Amino acid sequence: MFGLFRRRAIAKAPARRTGDYGEEQAAAYLKQQGFRIRARNVQYEGREELDLVVEDRTTRRFIEVKTRRQLPGAESRYGTPMAAVASDKRRHILNAARRYTAAHPTRKTAQFDIVEVYLDPTCDAPRVLAVHHLQDAFRT
């Protein structure tokens, strides 16, 4: 009877694993470009979350990472990664950024970027085809 109440390990959904992998690749790319990773997967209640927070000398960037198993520039049923960051998603990112900044004040300029990670759609194992960093992708 008590066996019914045992917790079972639930495997992450494939889309979530793909997203996690994309975030790792985006962080590695940004680090290689000279940014310092300040935070990953910052979550507040509701849908407010920040995938990555990175900084350089003058700017704090709030990064939304979108990962797709598609060729760069190709259309998919989900549209382009950038198109997936619609007005509702942007509002959630802006609110999360305000909360993060209230908890971690800085004099640096805030900027909102999108990093698109493209994975080879023909491979089962993830293989990065391209990483596109769209700087200052949207404003407050």
Can you annotate each of these PLM segments?
Residues 67-122:
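Catalytic cores of nucleic-acid endonucleases
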